[in-house]
Amino acid sequence: LAEFDLINDSRALGIQPFSTATENAFLENLTHALENIWLSQSKYVIHKEVAISQVFQDNMTYDDLFYMGRFDFVVYEKQGKKELPVLAIELDGKEHFEDAVVQERDRKKNAICQAHNMEIIRVENSYARRYNHIKGILMDYFSRVH
């Protein structure tokens, strides 16, 4: 509980905890890479901290995570005035490799994406600031789906 309070106090003071700073750096690199891949055609947009229930219309797995969980990032394809989700991206810290509860939540997120035919890509925190790595992941994804 103290850690949670510390994070909230830090955010209230305008000080970003490490994870938020890492996520923001990742989002900046992700956005930059996406723009470079599509040469600023503005074909895609990225949203951060998206509720799983906002991405998919139906809960095929009937799991609480569907209603409570969030994706770190979702890439949407612009189609007219609509935005269609095409890719979920999770930024994974060490807890994703060491904590059984977090690993189970990750398995459920993977299953939800699989049930809805949407790819989920997991990126280790240590790569969050590595632009070329992030661009490579996106180029690999788009080369397979387009």
Predicted regions and their residues:
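Nucleic-acid endo/exonuclease domains
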Residues: 1-146
